[in-house]
């Protein structure tokens, strides 16, 4: 499916006072419907690569599974845009938990979430890793330079799993949430520990993005964009260091600055 990630079309470009017809490369969108235990569960609009990682990461993020071994069958039908997933224990899945928006509290401390499953799956960060300011800047630069699809199209989000010195894994998608789910799915498929890892991200740190990072289990999120106020509240409560506006040699630390090495 990798050859379907981008497409070339004719466009009319205005430049230096003139309009000319040129070829331009753009990213594709792919609707992917997940059939879970024989019933339609969700349709994800995504960049069509690393599909297995995306679906497994999404299911884990939603609290449907915790481990890859909970999946009995996983089949991709590329021609129709369907993924069929059967769980080992389908009787444990309550469909109501994944279709109704509710507010729950975590550990009796009044934490507010969008879905009841967030209460079960968001993890309070426990890692005491520290990162230098220089590494924050370098990791962001490496991620931006490492995305060929972004360089070609300007139409995708990037997310990278890193240690405090280098990028370990990068995923790209038109949806910022999808890019994070692909990281999560890769970790589950490969038994990769995230305890002392961090995420570098191209999009803004919204509350949904912060929650996905918490579910993955990282303790530091670095973004070139701004966080929202609700995301900062959640980061404070979940013991996550939120770093934003990483650009031009500077950045802001919004929560838990003790993880920044002086």
From Swiss-Prot:
GO terms for cellular component: cytoplasm. InterPro entries: Cytidine_deaminase-like, FdhD. The active site is at 107 (cysteine persulfide intermediate). Keywords: Cytoplasm, Molybdenum cofactor biosynthesis. It holds the Pfam family FdhD-NarQ. The keyword Cytoplasm applies. It is found in: Cytoplasm. One of its GO terms (molecular function) is sulfurtransferase activity. GO terms for biological process: Mo-molybdopterin cofactor biosynthetic process. Required for formate dehydrogenase (FDH) activity. Acts as a sulfur carrier protein that transfers sulfur from IscS to the molybdenum cofactor prior to its insertion into FDH. Belongs to the FdhD family. This is Sulfur carrier protein FdhD. It comes from Bacillus subtilis (strain 168).
């Amino acid at each position: 499916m990798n050859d379907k990630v981008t497409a070339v079309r004719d466009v009319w470009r205005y430049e230096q006072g003139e309009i000319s017809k040129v070829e331009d490369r753009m990213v594709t969108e792919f609707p992917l419907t997940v059939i879970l235990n024989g019933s339609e569960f969700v349709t994800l609009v995504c960049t069509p690569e690393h599909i297995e990682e995306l679906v497994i990461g999404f299911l884990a993020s939603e609290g449907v599974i915790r481990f890859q071994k909970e999946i009995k069958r996983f089949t991709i039908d590329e021609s129709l845009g369907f993924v069929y997933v059967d769980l080992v224990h389908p009787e444990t899945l309550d469909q109501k938990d994944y279709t109704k928006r509710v507010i729950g509290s975590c550990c009796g401390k009044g934490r507010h979430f969008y879905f009841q499953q967030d209460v079960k799956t968001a993890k309070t960060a426990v890692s005491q890793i520290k990162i230098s300011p220089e590494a924050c800047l370098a990791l962001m630069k490496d991620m931006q330079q490492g995305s060929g699809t972004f360089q070609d199209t300007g139409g995708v989000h990037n997310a990278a799993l890193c240690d405090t010195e280098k990028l370990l894994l990068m995923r790209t998608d038109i949806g910022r949430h999808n890019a994070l789910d692909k990281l999560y799915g890769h970790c589950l498929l490969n038994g990769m520990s995230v305890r002392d890892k961090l995420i570098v991200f191209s999009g803004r740190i919204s509350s949904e993005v912060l929650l996905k990072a918490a579910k993955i289990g990282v303790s530091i999120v670095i973004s070139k964009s701004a966080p929202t106020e609700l995301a900062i509240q959640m980061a404070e409560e979940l013991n996550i260091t939120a770093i934003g506006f990483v650009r031009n040699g500077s950045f802001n630390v919004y929560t838990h600055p003790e993880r920044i090495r002086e």
